[in-house]
């Protein structure tokens, strides 16, 4: 709990390097494509649509991302809820490059979720990322448009 409070404190006191407004809560729509790595020499693509919320701006050190999406494919179909922390290592006035990680809860049968790692580019109105979930052998890409 102390680490979580420290993370929120770091997010709230992060100093802005740009002239952006003070908005720190962004909501958006999300689209993704997952490509489950082959178990039997077949690739199983899945497609997802959902909504995301980002707490923090691209010019701050840390962003917290969550949301819900529905993924559909041959290997996995169901709702997923990611809770991720992104660290903006390459911060600019309008864009940032980040590394992130967290847990993605799944509501598909007896499977409950997996750790998720990602790297991407973020702007005020978008997030473009590549992610990997080692437990599932899931390599994918996603795009979020924030309003």
Where are the model-predicted features located?
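Cleavable N-terminal export/targeting peptides
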Residues: 1-26
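Short glycine/proline-enriched turn or capping motifs at secondary-structure junctions
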Residues: 3, 132-141
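A signal for specific C-terminal beta-sheet/loop modules enriched in small/flexible residues
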Residues: 9-10, 139-147
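Short glycine/proline- and aromatic-enriched beta-strand/turn motifs that initiate or cap beta-hairpins
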Residues: 19-57, 61-63, 144-146
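Residues that define the transmembrane beta-barrel architecture of outer-membrane proteins
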Residues: 23-27, 41-49, 75-81, 95-97, ...
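Transmembrane beta-strand segments that form the barrel wall of outer-membrane beta-barrel proteins
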Residues: 27-39, 61-72, 96-107, 124-136
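Gram-negative (and chloroplast) outer-membrane scaffold detector with strong preference
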Residues: 48-109
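Structural signature of outer-membrane beta-barrel channels/translocons
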Residues: 52-58, 86-92, 120-126, 133, ...
